[in-house]
Amino acid sequence: MKAIIVLLMVVTSNADRICTGITSSNSPHVVKTATQGEVNVTGVIPLTTTPTKSHFANLKGTKTRGKLCPNCLNCTDLDVALARPMCIGTIPSAKASILHEVRPVTSGCFPIMHDRTKIRQLPNLLRGYENIRLSTHNVINAERAPGGPYRLGTSGSCPNVTSRSGFFATMAWAVPRDNKTATNPLTVEVPYICTKGEDQITVWGFHSDNKIQMNKLYGDSNPQKFTSSANGVTTHYVSQIGGFPNQTEDGGLPQSGRIVVDYMVQKPGKTGTIVYQRGVLLPQKVWCASGRSKVIKGSLPLIGEADCLHEKYGGLNKSKPYYTGEHAKAIGNCPIWVKTPLKLANGTKYRPPAKLLKER
């Protein structure tokens, strides 16, 4: 009983020092809430990061494709897509691809009128497939195509392993052997020859030059008409005659002519058609492509690995669930973009020390 009386006396004698509520020092952490606006809390965990620009990398757990053909030295992706001699090789399969050539200005072999068609898009089209292979057989016999017989034209800028001159493996430059005369539009059917249910990408085009060269090669110096049709898409062209400055490609002879190159996508079992006059570049080997590969704009080389590939920041490792800064396309295990930093309150709402209770 005595012990109890002593305890009560201690409490009573120190009543002016008892505080109510939570005591803490002034908190520097402020969070915005949905119901109370800005609130001071005793602790927070940052949920956002602001990345810095870095090199691009291989995506963790995924095959990442940089160049279409890594082993094709001194070749642009357009060289590979058109199967330029010395630029033919294996394209590795990949679930993710880096678009590193935005506007290739040359493809070797022969001066191309890039802006007449969507040919600049061909490497990017191929890049969007997981599996890509070039057919081992030609899709048509170009020498015996309608309007022939033809000899196959070559360029000194296209040396191959057996000759100082050649041409793209995807096309045959059809030059009449004997019947160098004007012709009405001719039609050739392009069969589907891929064997695994892939999309078939068929490359074709036409050559045009000045009037003297057109007469010499084809016996007709007038503008020529061309049409391709496949998978419900039809494209028309009329060739331009003359007006081209001489241009040299990769050490070959100066060329007064130009070629226009296009492609058509054929679905499994579907036949395409090409209607043409003189100067046609008939399709030969075709691309067989399947699966999907995610494509993102970036740069080479790919160094190391990263959780995420971001068009503005390169390779990112996911240290926080959200990020601020520049918003752009990203692929992989990426943080989510937010306008302002996010914080998770892991403490309590800050309360100032309660006023001391005074004895009356």
UniProtKB/Swiss-Prot annotation:
Q: Which InterPro entries match?
A: Capsid_hemagglutn (IPR008980), Hemagglutn_HA1_a/b_dom_sf (IPR013828), Hemagglutn_influenz_A/B (IPR001364)
Main localization is virion
Tell me a GO biological process for this protein.
virion attachment to host cell
Post-translational note: In natural infection, inactive HA is matured into HA1 and HA2 outside the cell by one or more trypsin-like, arginine-specific endoprotease secreted by the bronchial epithelial cells. One identified protease that may be involved in this process is secreted in lungs by club cells. Palmitoylated.
User: Which first-to-last residue range defines the signal peptide?
Assistant: 1-15
Q: Subcellular localization, per the record?
A: Virion membrane; Host apical cell membrane
State the membrane topology. Single-pass type I membrane protein
On whether Signal is a keyword of this UniProt record, the answer is yes
Q: Which GO terms describe its molecular function?
A: host cell surface receptor binding
What Pfam family is a match for this entry?
A: Hemagglutinin
* Keyword entries, A-Z: Disulfide bond, Fusion of virus membrane with host endosomal membrane, Fusion of virus membrane with host membrane, Glycoprotein, Hemagglutinin, Host cell membrane, Host membrane, Host-virus interaction, Lipoprotein, Membrane, Palmitate, Signal, Transmembrane, Viral attachment to host cell, Viral envelope protein, Viral penetration into host cytoplasm, Virion, Virus entry into host cell
This entry carries the following GO cellular component terms, namely: host cell plasma membrane; membrane; viral envelope; virion membrane
Has keyword Nucleotide-binding? no
What is this protein's function? Binds to sialic acid-containing receptors on the cell surface, bringing about the attachment of the virus particle to the cell. Plays a major role in the determination of host range restriction and virulence. Class I viral fusion protein. Responsible for penetration of the virus into the cell cytoplasm by mediating the fusion of the membrane of the endocytosed virus particle with the endosomal membrane. Low pH in endosomes induce an irreversible conformational change in HA2, releasing the fusion hydrophobic peptide. Several trimers are required to form a competent fusion pore.
Give additional notes from the record: Major glycoprotein, comprises over 80% of the envelope proteins present in virus particle. The extent of infection into host organism is determined by HA. Influenza viruses bud from the apical surface of polarized epithelial cells (e.g. bronchial epithelial cells) into lumen of lungs and are therefore usually pneumotropic. The reason is that HA is cleaved by tryptase clara which is restricted to lungs. However, HAs of H5 and H7 pantropic avian viruses subtypes can be cleaved by furin and subtilisin-type enzymes, allowing the virus to grow in other organs than lungs.
Name listed for the protein in its UniProt record: Hemagglutinin
* Source species of the chain: Influenza B virus (strain B/Texas/1/1991)
